[in-house]
């Protein structure tokens, strides 16, 4: 059990020094934290033991947190660690700098349809991931959807949701009334997933319209509107998305759209990245994955026989079984995402003979994809010779490193044209060193600091090119050969912030607050220049946004 300590007048929990308050929730505050050694920023949710003890949910929260630490989805805020003190639980979570979707809509108004669809696809993918692992959110709203620096959605606050099982009904009313389903505000029994679908429908409406489908400052009138299920559909919404909204906002939960229905809807399927809903036909649920079993044993400090007994018990809520399936699912998601983020290393049997290849000016073979030349031979050796321990060490090939980048078989000029298009779309600035080498920077909207990286297109064999990403620290001096050509791509919303939670027995007497206006090649850490602060994480975010944009 960790103890709270003082660090230069600030509270320190474990290795994290707590800073400013990011928000206040039902059970306590959320503060920004900084790792004392690495400087990486995290969000720290503080759960007051006394408050959760009064609700008799201490044991349940502990069990949920144990499983949520294993959740790994690109659009769910990660829970890294839980630190306990005599008075509080400290949930150390992923920090994103873009703020709440709610604030974004309040500031910018309704979102363009294509962008709304992209965000909604990400949100639904995250909700589906949690539902498949028996977790319901029950309080989905734009305030719980966070945005990273590149406008990708990340759902937060799964930590206090109920684990669900077949036949179990959630009797508690929680959440914000504007986003709550009719069965929730009416105090009726509900199973769980369908209330998240309703809330997703409200979020989609807010994205497309900049307002809420059900809204009234008088709570009893608001409840009447929600129970009636009648809402205004603006003329500018196309018929396809309007039918989807009406299906998701069905008052009868039995008639309401399921995630399967939404995924099959024509509007939702447009430009849908496959990594959001991975399918692996080779996966057989009847085959036990030994590596996953070992990983569960390491994380839970248990024996393999205990894990096997949990898997054969058939209890979907057993914590070891849940952990095992999480690990399997995460692996499947990463494999599917490889179409967008993973560029595999070149075939190890390829020969790098410059005389056999035409290399455009400014483009060079990748230095770590070229075997060393033998002094008495004009030809290069096969990289597989490095595995032959019987050969002299002087002839051994140095093991190739992994690099952050994208591999492609397109023409080099076409690759660079796509890079320029993506950089302009992302509002990056760049300097041209030569036709295949750029120095790029992006300004962090929160800190105001610039994140810099080098993009270099390499030839890896006679058919493939590697666009290599390399972090540039502030101390790196720009090469004089580059020509400085910085490039940049070039209302009041009807949303208000409802109460963060409500009790179904007293909700009718509450009034709402006022309106507000308004193909990763892997990464060797040697190719990244880690330093104190969030530079490395900013660099990876920058890489991810560029890779994602190029993949579209």
Swiss-Prot record:
Pfam families: AdenylateSensor (PF16579), AMPK_alpha_AID (PF21147), Pkinase (PF00069). Changing residue 45 to R: Complete loss of kinase activity. Its cofactor is Mg(2+). Residues 511-521 have a biased composition (Low complexity). Residues 16-268 form the Protein kinase domain. Activated by phosphorylation on Thr-172. Binding of AMP to non-catalytic gamma subunit (PRKAG1, PRKAG2 or PRKAG3) results in allosteric activation, inducing phosphorylation on Thr-172. AMP-binding to gamma subunit also sustains activity by preventing dephosphorylation of Thr-172. ADP also stimulates Thr-172 phosphorylation, without stimulating already phosphorylated AMPK. ATP promotes dephosphorylation of Thr-172, rendering the enzyme inactive. Under physiological conditions AMPK mainly exists in its inactive form in complex with ATP, which is much more abundant than AMP. Keywords: ATP-binding, Autophagy, Biological rhythms, Cholesterol biosynthesis, Cholesterol metabolism, Chromatin regulator, Cytoplasm, Fatty acid biosynthesis, Fatty acid metabolism, Kinase, Lipid biosynthesis, Lipid metabolism, Magnesium, Metal-binding, Nucleotide-binding, Nucleus, Phosphoprotein, Serine/threonine-protein kinase, Steroid biosynthesis, Steroid metabolism, Sterol biosynthesis, Sterol metabolism, Transcription, Transcription regulation, Transferase, Ubl conjugation, Wnt signaling pathway. Changing residue 371 to T: In breast cancer samples; infiltrating ductal carcinoma; somatic mutation. ATP binds at residues 22-30, 45. This is 5'-AMP-activated protein kinase catalytic subunit alpha-2. It comes from Homo sapiens.
């Amino acid at each position: 059990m960790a103890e709270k300590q003082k660090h230069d007048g600030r509270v320190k929990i474990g290795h994290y020094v707590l800073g400013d308050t990011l928000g206040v929730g039902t059970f306590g505050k959320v503060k920004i934290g900084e790792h004392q050694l690495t400087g990486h920023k995290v969000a720290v949710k503080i759960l007051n033991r006394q408050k959760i003890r009064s609700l008799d949910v201490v044991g349940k929260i502990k069990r949920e947190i144990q499983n949520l630490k294993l959740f790994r989805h690109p659009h769910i805020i990660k829970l890294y660690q839980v630190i306990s003190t005599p008075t509080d639980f400290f949930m150390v979570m992923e920090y994103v700098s873009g703020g709440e979707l709610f604030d974004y809509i309040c500031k910018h108004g309704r979102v363009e349809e294509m962008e709304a669809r992209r965000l909604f696809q990400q949100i639904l993918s995250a909700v589906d991931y949690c539902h498949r692992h028996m977790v319901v959110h029950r309080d989905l709203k734009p305030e719980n959807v966070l945005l990273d620096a590149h406008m990708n959605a990340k759902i937060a606050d799964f930590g206090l949701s109920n684990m669900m099982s077949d036949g179990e009904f959630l009797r508690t009313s929680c959440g914000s009334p504007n986003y709550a389903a009719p069965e929730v505000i009416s105090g009726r029994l509900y199973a769980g997933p369908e209330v998240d679908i309703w809330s997703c429908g409200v979020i989609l409406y807010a994205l497309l319209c900049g307002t809420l489908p059900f809204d009234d400052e008088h709570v009893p009138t608001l409840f009447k509107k929600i129970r009636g299920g009648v809402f205004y559909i603006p003329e500018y919404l196309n018929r396809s998305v309007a039918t989807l909204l009406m299906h998701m906002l069905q008052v009868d939960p039995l008639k309401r759209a399921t995630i399967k229905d939404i995924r099959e809807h024509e509007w939702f399927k447009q430009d849908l990245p496959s990594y959001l809903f991975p399918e692996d036909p080779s996966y057989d649920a009847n085959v036990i994955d030994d590596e996953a079993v070992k990983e569960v044993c390491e994380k839970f400090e248990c024996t393999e026989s205990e894990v096997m007994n949990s898997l054969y018990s058939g209890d979907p809520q057993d914590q070891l079984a849940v952990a095992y399936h999480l690990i399997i699912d995460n692996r499947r998601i990463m494999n599917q995402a490889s179409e967008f983020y993973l560029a595999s290393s070149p075939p190890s049997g390829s020969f790098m003979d410059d005389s056999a290849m035409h290399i455009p000016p400014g483009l060079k073979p990748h230095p770590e994809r070229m075997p060393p030349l033998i002094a008495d031979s004009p030809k290069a050796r096969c990289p597989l010779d490095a595995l032959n321990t019987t050969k002299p060490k002087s002839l051994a090939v140095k093991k190739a490193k992994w690099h952050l980048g994208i591999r492609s078989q397109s023409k080099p000029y076409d690759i660079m044209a796509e890079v320029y298009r993506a950089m302009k779309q992302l509002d990056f600035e760049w300097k041209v060193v030569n036709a295949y080498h750029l120095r790029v920077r992006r300004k962090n909207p929160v800190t105001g600091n610039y994140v810099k990286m080098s993009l270099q297109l390499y030839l890896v064999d006679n058919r493939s090119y590697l666009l290599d990403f390399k972090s540039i620290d502030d101390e790196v001096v720009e090469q004089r050969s580059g020509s400085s050509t910085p490039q940049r791509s070039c209302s009041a919303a009807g949303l208000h912030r409802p109460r963060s939670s409500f009790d179904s027995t007293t909700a009718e007497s509450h009034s709402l607050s006022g309106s507000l206006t308004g193909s990763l090649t892997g990464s060797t850490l040697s190719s990244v220049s880690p330093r104190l602060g969030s530079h490395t994480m900013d660099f990876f975010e920058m890489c991810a946004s560029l890779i994602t944009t190029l993949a579209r």
